[in-house]
């Protein structure tokens, strides 16, 4: 799993960017906000936070200019009916702090004004995430009371293709001090048959 890439921005396209890391070009999909930030830094060395999305027929890299956007993206993936492409579209509609504020305020009207978000999706986002995100401060948007191990286990199981709801239920049942390897191993045993 790739956590971040450090390299030079070679090209910025409509919905993706090309980053040269030690002679290898990685294409990352990103929100229009991140792409705008990267365009301004074209030719410079940068760090881009990465979410690796694995499907049966593809491996895609989603990039974020900061951790706040990445964490909000991962939270949006927990919403039923929101996949990576829709989550990027939502993030293209505003900065993480603005979207977070809409969710916490229960403002379905404002959320439904974001790209590709209808009334039902906006309501589902609020139902799933309201009260489960802490305020955006120096550390960004993070899930409440989640240990580092739980976060890593969740990320690993989602990257392996397990369904978000099953992963969340499973991880919430684990002790906070569990070793990451043990959690992933138990996840394989418990969630077999739960691939998307």
Swiss-Prot record:
UniProtKB keywords: Cytoplasm, DNA damage, DNA recombination, DNA repair, DNA-binding
Residue segments, region Domain I: 1-65
Single GO MF annotation: ATP binding
Key word Metal-binding present: no
BP term (GO), one: DNA recombination
Entry's Gene Ontology cellular component terms: cytoplasm; Holliday junction helicase complex; Holliday junction resolvase complex
SUPFAM superfamilies (UniProt xref): Nucleic acid-binding proteins (SSF50249), RuvA domain 2-like (SSF47781)
InterPro entries hit by this protein: DNA_helicase_Holl-junc_RuvA_I, Hlx-hairpin-Hlx_DNA-bd_motif, NA-bd_OB-fold, RuvA, RuvA_2-like, RuvA_C
SMART domains tied to this protein: HhH1
Top-level taxonomic group: Bacteria
Region of interest (Flexible linker), ranges: 140-144
Signal peptide: none
Subcellular localization, as worded in the UniProt entry: Cytoplasm
The keyword RNA-binding belongs to this UniProt entry's keyword annotation: no
Stretch list, region Domain III: 145-196
Region (Domain II), start-end ranges: 66-140
Main localization of the protein described in the UniProt heading: cytoplasm
Domain remark text: Has three domains with a flexible linker between the domains II and III and assumes an 'L' shape. Domain III is highly mobile and contacts RuvB.
Function: The RuvA-RuvB-RuvC complex processes Holliday junction (HJ) DNA during genetic recombination and DNA repair, while the RuvA-RuvB complex plays an important role in the rescue of blocked DNA replication forks via replication fork reversal (RFR). RuvA specifically binds to HJ cruciform DNA, conferring on it an open structure. The RuvB hexamer acts as an ATP-dependent pump, pulling dsDNA into and through the RuvAB complex. HJ branch migration allows RuvC to scan DNA until it finds its consensus sequence, where it cleaves and resolves the cruciform DNA.
Subunit structure: Homotetramer. Forms an RuvA(8)-RuvB(12)-Holliday junction (HJ) complex. HJ DNA is sandwiched between 2 RuvA tetramers; dsDNA enters through RuvA and exits via RuvB. An RuvB hexamer assembles on each DNA strand where it exits the tetramer. Each RuvB hexamer is contacted by two RuvA subunits (via domain III) on 2 adjacent RuvB subunits; this complex drives branch migration. In the full resolvosome a probable DNA-RuvA(4)-RuvB(12)-RuvC(2) complex forms which resolves the HJ.
Family stated for the protein in its record: Belongs to the RuvA family.
Protein name per UniProt: Holliday junction branch migration complex subunit RuvA
Gene name linked to the record: ruvA
